[in-house]
Amino acid sequence: MLYLPCLLLWAFPQFWGQSEVQQNYTFGCLQISSFANRSWSRTDSVVWLGDLQTHRWSNDSDTISFTKPWSQGKFSNQQWEKLQHMFQVYRTSFTRDIKEIVKMMSPKEDYPIEVQLSAGCEMYPGNASESFLHVAFQGEYVVRFHGTSWQKVPEAPSWLDLPIKMLNADEGTRETVQILLNDTCPQFVRGLLEAGKPDLEKQEKPVAWLSRGPNPAHGHLQLVCHVSGFHPKPVWVMWMRGDQEQGGTHRGDILPNADETWYLQATLDVEAGDEAGLACRVKHSSLEGQDIILYWGGRQVSPVLIFLIVGVLVLVVCAVAYYIIRKRRRSYQDIM
């Protein structure tokens, strides 16, 4: 009996996602298994709920590690131990079965090889959910579990037909996979959403600044808008001229900071002299509609700056009021 389906089982408490409160939440696992030869292999996994990592499982550890205080969700210790034991059995069996498949397919396929798996469930409003499991071989998406069976994607190589036939013949494992994806995963995620609500709903305001990048060509400038420290992950950043979006804006990948906030930069290449009047605009849920606008050349308007100015003005007013009251008291004492 092949245990590749268990890979999916493992993957259920793991799934990517992006989420906002009262919107869709994605829970997913990414497993990476590398096989240098028949005697050396390793498997590592990470689990995400929305933008937050909730679990990790190193090849060097027998147990799944929690990365959040609420990573067990609402599961009891007994429930969690049962799941963990199943995943331990799965990982051992998966490694063995992949080696058997490679042996069976030789010389068409041989070491080194890499297998990646992603699995989990996406939660929708009203307790609706949708599960998934995808398998990649040597970086190419080749197999999925859909409905009640394993399926080869159209572009997958023909040698996968036999392993998939064997997997689908194992009715007990297929039923277990369905239960884990369609029942256990949504149940576990609901508990995580409740237990991790403060972290999931956290709003961190972005900080933005401008800089000049390396000149892309003679007579041209590269303008760079940096945005950092924001959470949740979704953000909109664009170079503008007045109300006109600049189509040449290039946004890089959104990258994680060490404190679980995010960083993004947006660049714009312009001819020297055409940079006047350009501004970088940042929209984020934490700003509550008060966009950050940074003007190239020094003029800046942002909520943070406004709050600082207001704070300074309040301190000045308080100091003046204190001075006036104190002066009046002294005058009154002199009269007495």
Swiss-Prot record:
Gene3D superfamilies in alphabetical order: Immunoglobulins, MHC class I-like antigen recognition-like
Predominant place of localization: membrane
GO biological process terms on file: antigen processing and presentation; antigen processing and presentation, endogenous lipid antigen via MHC class Ib; antigen processing and presentation, exogenous lipid antigen via MHC class Ib; immune response; innate immune response; NK T cell differentiation; positive regulation of interleukin-2 production; positive regulation of interleukin-4 production
Residue stretches making up the Ig-like domain: 198-296
Lipid bilayer topology: Single-pass type I membrane protein
Any one Gene Ontology molecular-function term assigned to this protein's record: exogenous lipid antigen binding
Keyword tags: Cell membrane, Disulfide bond, Endoplasmic reticulum, Endosome, Glycoprotein, Immunity, Immunoglobulin domain, Innate immunity, Lysosome, Membrane, Signal, Transmembrane, Transmembrane helix
Residues engaged in binding a D-galactosylceramide: D97, D170, E171, G172, T173
Membrane topology (Extracellular): 18-304
Locations listed in the record: Cell membrane; Basolateral cell membrane; Endosome membrane; Lysosome membrane
Motif Internalization signal per UniProt: ranges: 332-335
Disulfide bridges in this chain: C121-C185, C225-C280
Ranges of the Cytoplasmic topological domain: 326-336
InterPro entries attached to this UniProt entry: Ig-like_dom (IPR007110), Ig-like_dom_sf (IPR036179), Ig-like_fold (IPR013783), Ig_C1-set (IPR003597), MHC_class-I_related (IPR050208), MHC_I-like_Ag-recog (IPR011161), MHC_I-like_Ag-recog_sf (IPR037055), MHC_I/II-like_Ag-recog (IPR011162)
Glycosylation sites: N24, N37, N59, N127, N182
Keyword Acyltransferase: no
Gene Ontology, cellular component aspect: basolateral plasma membrane; cell surface; cytoplasm; early endosome; endoplasmic reticulum membrane; endosome membrane; external side of plasma membrane; extracellular space
CDD domains: IgC1_CD1 (cd21029)
Keyword Cell inner membrane: no
Signal peptide coordinates: 1-17
Transmembrane segments: 305-325
Superkingdom of source: Eukaryota
Function: Antigen-presenting protein that binds self and non-self glycolipids and presents them to T-cell receptors on natural killer T-cells.
Note: During protein synthesis and maturation, CD1 family members bind endogenous lipids that are replaced by lipid or glycolipid antigens when the proteins are internalized and pass through endosomes, before trafficking back to the cell surface.
Quaternary assembly: Heterodimer with B2M (beta-2-microglobulin). Interacts with MHC II and CD74.
Protein name listed in UniProt: Antigen-presenting glycoprotein CD1d
Organism per entry: Rattus norvegicus
Phylogenetic classification of the source organism: Eukaryota, Metazoa, Chordata, Craniata, Vertebrata
Originating gene: Cd1d
